[in-house]
Amino acid sequence: MKATISITTIFLVVALAAPSLARPDNHVEDSVGRLLRPGQTYHIVPANPETGGGIFSNSEEICPLDIFQSNNPLDLGLPIKFKSELWFVKEMNSITIEFEAPNWFLCPKESKGWRVVYSEEFKKSLIISTGGSSNPSGFQIHRVDGGAYKIVYCTNISTTTCMNVGIFTDISGARRLALTSDEALLVKFQKAATPKADLKTKLRMFPFY
């Protein structure tokens, strides 16, 4: 069960500030060097393909859906889109991340937006789930070495104190996205195929782990 206690309280105990490697113009780029644009669809893929595949949603409780990384390096995961108050996605700016999945049939009334929830079940972790607000949600993108990026979550109390979005492997071997003060999941953003072509290859909502 997902408890509803103060995420901010837990967050401030373990959050670590990280140094910035932002570009001078702060623009985030996709995997081929084009500017990341709000409203367009992308796949979040690992910077190192040997660490698994893309990002998808699933849950034993059906709704809301938690967010996972596929173990299959060939699986691009579900497409996502970003929402921002700017024309381009910029580093260290608060954004909304949500799945762009027309076959969201299991949770038709549930938001596709990402959010952070506290989980007693998974070792009192702060895991990433769906059901988030359409407003800027505290997620940011930060550049790291080698042209890769990491996704971080910053509270509305301190936008300079953030936690990394990393991987928590549960007892079933599933790789859940969760907040961590340790190693982040390093990613790149791959432009999704046309909606029709992408839907044809992603009709399933639950890719294999």
From Swiss-Prot:
Report the record's disulfide bonds: C63-C107, C154-C162
Residues bearing glycans: N156
Stored SUPFAM superfamilies: STI-like
One Pfam family this sequence matches: Kunitz_legume
CDD domains with a match to the protein in the record:
beta-trefoil_STI
Q: Which GO terms describe its molecular function?
A: peptidase inhibitor activity; serine-type endopeptidase inhibitor activity
Q: Which residues form the signal peptide?
A: 1-22
User: What keywords appear on the UniProt entry?
Assistant: Disulfide bond, Glycoprotein, Protease inhibitor, Serine protease inhibitor, Signal
* Organism superkingdom: Eukaryota
Biological process annotations from GO: response to water deprivation
Q: Which family does it belong to?
A: Belongs to the protease inhibitor I3 (leguminous Kunitz-type inhibitor) family.
Q: What does this protein do?
A: Exhibits Kunitz trypsin protease inhibitor activity.
Task: Output this protein's name.
Answer: Kunitz trypsin inhibitor 1
Q: Which organism is it from?
A: Arabidopsis thaliana
